[in-house]
Amino acid sequence: MKPIHTIHRRESKQIFVGNVAIGGDAPISVQSMTNTKTTDVKATLKQISEIEEAGADLVRVSIPTMEAARAFKVIKEQVTIPLIADIHFDYKIALEVAKYGADCLRINPGNIGRVDYISEVVASAKDHDIPIRIGVNAGSLEKYLQKKYTRPTPEAMVESALRHIDILDKLNFDNFKISLKASEIFMTVFAYQQLSSQIDNPLHLGITEAGSLSFGTVKSSIGLGLLLSKGIGDTIRVSLASDPVDEVRVAFNILKSLNLRQKGVNLIACPSCSRQKFDVIKVVSELESRFKDIITPIDVSVIGCVVNGPGEAKSVSVGLTGGDPNLLYLDGKTHSKIINENLVNELEAQVRNSLKNL
């Protein structure tokens, strides 16, 4: 399906997290974060594998203690997907995981401490040729900013980011990306808009603490969608109180909806009504489950009646229109009649067969 609008992305420098390019002309990457105890190596490895299988490009791992840092070393030795070490409060943990092969160090300006601590982290990042993410969060701004602004604001977040960018500039370090996250959509959007016009470093997008799978998906889609539609953003993480695999799927659905990155089946389906000639909701649910393993982009339509079915089918690889009889379309042309009992199996078979020709 040919998009009617192309988003022109903001020009930015390019950095690498492991073998994944961030910024420049690289595709917008997707990441998630483990929620296991990092010291539980087996559980963390299992979750990293699940996140990777869902299609994530990067995985972030929380390193709250030196014990977790030592566990990270064991974990890093057993995975190939780039790992980002999430560091708060203790800069020495960042120094440790850099030695253990972290592909990126995430530090929080609000709690990492003094400039000399940051200087040591930067020196370590230089030694190991790894980038840093300056991760500004509205909920953990520096105390002087809390006093100055009295409450979190986009301006406070941008000031925090610019202060730390200045520190890195003075240390001759430009291998970094920035994030400005809040749980409130417009605070996040305004902060990114303000900062993006002042710097050309890659931007990591996210609505932090977005909430449950249902509500958090809506908040993240609106917030990230507003920014991405304006060309802002080089890597994204959807933060949900849910399985990290859900974060990956939602992130790709956001990118897919904006035609920024295609992955897997783009399933176009009607909401159904009394005109439907088969159970649209049941068929779509079953197909979504069966299509989870598909990575190659392909457009598929499932429409319950002839009002919009034929029209939608003309612009997809595989289309189904409800009727008497139901009609299956391939590449916009009528292919065959299909009875309700065979809908899911036949449609899946045709999709997988069409993938061979893409």
Swiss-Prot record:
HAMAP family: IspG. It is an enzyme of class 1 (oxidoreductase). InterPro entries: Dihydropteroate_synth-like_sf, IspG_bac, IspG_bac-typ, NO2/SO3_Rdtase_4Fe4S_sf. Its EC number is 1.17.7.3. Its cofactor is [4Fe-4S] cluster. GO terms for biological process: isopentenyl diphosphate biosynthetic process, methylerythritol 4-phosphate pathway; terpenoid biosynthetic process. [4Fe-4S] cluster binds at C270, C273, C305, E312. Pathway: Isoprenoid biosynthesis; isopentenyl diphosphate biosynthesis via DXP pathway; isopentenyl diphosphate from 1-deoxy-D-xylulose 5-phosphate: step 5/6. One of its GO terms (molecular function) is 4 iron, 4 sulfur cluster binding. Gene3D superfamilies: Dihydropteroate synthase-like, Sulfite Reductase Hemoprotein, domain 1. Converts 2C-methyl-D-erythritol 2,4-cyclodiphosphate (ME-2,4cPP) into 1-hydroxy-2-methyl-2-(E)-butenyl 4-diphosphate. Keywords: 4Fe-4S, Iron, Iron-sulfur, Isoprene biosynthesis, Metal-binding, Oxidoreductase. It catalyses: (2E)-4-hydroxy-3-methylbut-2-enyl diphosphate + oxidized [flavodoxin] + H2O + 2 H(+) = 2-C-methyl-D-erythritol 2,4-cyclic diphosphate + reduced [flavodoxin]. This is 4-hydroxy-3-methylbut-2-en-1-yl diphosphate synthase (flavodoxin). Binds 1 [4Fe-4S] cluster.
